[in-house]
Amino acid sequence: MNQKEINELRRRFRPEKSAISRVYGCYVNSSKEIVSDLDESLGMMPQEESEKYLSLLKKGLSGSLGKNLIDIVFSTQQVADSEEHRLLTTLWDSQLKDNEARQTFYHKVIDSLDMGDSSYLLLLTCDSYDVPHRGKDDSLQADASDEVFTYIVCVVCPIKEGKVELGYFPGDNEFHCAAEQTVAPPELGFLFPAFDDRAANIYNALFYSRKANEIHQEFIDAIFHVEAPMSAVEQKEAFQSALSDAFDCSLEVMQTVHEQLCEKIKEHRESRSSEPLEMSASEIGQILQSCGIADEQVAAFQENCGEQFGSGVVLNPANLIDSSRFEIKTPEITISADPEYSYLVETQIINGRKYLLIPAEDGVEVNGFAVGITVAQKDD
């Protein structure tokens, strides 16, 4: 799926556009026991409550592609005959009305998911989208629909315990201490089937993780039974390892790599392309060559990438660097700079000692106080 297709589905979760009639799910306590089973009509709820449910479900389609939203790909064999795909298909075909399939799914999630000591609300819903035709000018023509896309969305929301406060209990006509429980935004979730080329693709699902460094591999293995993809944090660490194992990285090389990857990210953002940004290891190798890195070291980097990520892999630069800052650390000091001005940081050896140099003209502040830079006078 691309960003445009995700955005198109996200708009379905607005109250004025939603055709979702029911939500299903269960409340699971910290002992992995189902406390309550949910089967509710949105139309019978107060509007404020139904909007809360839609908002939680919509969160399962938020974040960045390749970082929070990850493609799950089923093998042909899985689609043809596998327990995991058969269960998802049963839920989908029945539009979640098959109670036995729902209960089987709930217990699969409960048995596998590690949420620590947190209780959680598991939510499921189904929507049928009358897909409008998209014109040559990219506009949607609602009266020219020729396909209905039916899909299910699942989200897992932690239950947060509020602070203990004194409150009034009308039944007792007394004040007592109590802590309110609230449903937090989803920690993870998925959409099935994928909405590829604006049509159902049963060979794919879209997985959501709120934290890019915690993608709940145990859930992916149990529900989809596929090899969990590398998280964005793991990709960044693997990229750093591929670089450092190939050659000794200098500040100047890392400045150039960071600068050029930032430029690629900026160009992609400005292009408003719906497809995720991708670069091959050989394209990054060309950046290294422009820094003066020897051909054999560039080849070693590309080989390392193959070992770390797999043969012929394409990389998303947004997962390899933090494009919002350029940070340099020593054991005692951290320097954080706007990537646009990272070139101002230089290295120099003075009297045998290594230094990081930053030009300091006007506008220097220390803890919010404006200060001047003076030259210390040496005693004769």
What label would you give each PLM region?
Residues 3-7:
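Soluble regions of membrane-associated proteins that transit the secretory/organelle pathway
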Residues 275, 287-380:
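C-terminal, beta-strand-rich globular interaction domains
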Residues 17, 21-322:
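Long, hydrophobic alpha/beta structural blocks
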Residues 8-12:
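Post-signal/leader-peptide non-cytosolic segments of secretory proteins
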